[in-house]
Amino acid sequence: MKRTKTIVTKLLLLTTTAGLLFSCGNGGRSETLSETTLAIETETVQETTELEARQAIPDELPERDFAGYEYRILTYSPTAYEVEELTGDVVEDAKYDRNLKIGERFNVTIRAVPSPGIKELDKELKQSVISGDNAYDIAIPHQITSGPGFITSQSILTWNDVPYVNPDKPWWNQTINETINILGQQYYMAGYVTMPTPFCMFVNKAMLADQGFDDMYHTVREGKWTIDKLIEMTATVSGDLNGDGKMDSADRWGISFNNDNNTLNFMYACGILSVLIEEGRPVPNTNNDRMIAFIEKLYELYHNGNRSLVTTYQNQGELGMGGFKDARILIKCGSVSDLAQLREAEIDVGVSPYPKWDEAQERYATHVDAWNGMLCIPKTADNLERTGIVMEAMAAETYKYVIPAYYDVALGTKYVRDTESMEMLDIIFASVVYDFGYIFDSWNGCTWTAPNLMTRKSTNVASYWQSIEKKVTSHYDKLYAAVEEDIAQRAE
């Protein structure tokens, strides 16, 4: 959609005003200054806004009538995919309008079937496939809990042969096609439709200025936000506030993160994936010089200099977020969803991506938590054209309308306090990566090299890899064999 804008110059405004004054001052004469001395032209300009350009991208879907079909999505986050009525909340109303528009276009009703939890969803889908009841068109499982198991149990189809799903469209994550496949088989898809909440960092801007680092946003823009810079910034912040001679959660810290996914995300931010795909086969990316150098650098941040308050996954809210809100922590690692917790905070909060490994690294990178599920197709799905068309439409409409509402209206007006942080969010959302190992590792240790070694206060990558190599190799051999079997069966 293009907006036509007529540009009227200040000179024209001045001329009109002068003409009115001239008319009034000459006994009601109708002649104006513009009529006698000036010829003013207006210029019509076609201007397309970023939002209009986004919404103008065609989904290239055919017209179909699915005769009132109920399109069922199995999920533990039902409100992301179905909203029953308009509520006045801009994001929820955008989801409602999305489904209504798709429903009218294709004569379908979109239904989110809620599961009480991640394990229950895993069990429900597998049982549904075994019974052959075709209960669901799409399932959105927890990445780690169900990622490999749905493949080895042959519970899902691949997206490769689903018509009308175009992974090159901007509403799909562009890295997942390269990193989450085996022998070219794409069992999972992800994009804006799953409402990702990537990991990021929150910064106390007043503390930052006190430390002499008051232009962090410029550092990010220039590509100079690196792990070395983070170590430098957090080196002199910590202090024993209560004077008890020890550093604990009541004191001042340079940075805080949990010993779980916050720690793991440093690896992704530094451009490292735990598993690579070579000739269609998963190959662990653990015991090498790059990982060793990263682990040594992370150890410095983690354990040296009393700069880091490391929490558990369970107490990160109380200790990490609590200390950040109380202005005792310079930088807090978290995810974009944590912005809601900071809405009423009295400190001046900024947002930034995780740091890169070095300035030579081309782009910033971040991951999403496993709770940001991925899309898969139950093996019992009986109409792949319908499956593809409706999901492609949902992905496209989410990208065009729901995400702008969430991003610009909800984040921009409710949570983010400065334009620079919105700029940082642009960088963060554009840098989401998916790691084969994170999804398919099944807690076997390959992906969690960094958190596990940091917990053990060790940098001995070789020893760690030796302790898990047999288990990891066996795990991926079984996964690879399951895909080979699936390909063979479909070829029969």
Where are these regions (language model features)?
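Glycine-centered hinge/linker elements that transmit conformational signals in sensory
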Residues: 231-235, 266-267, 272-314
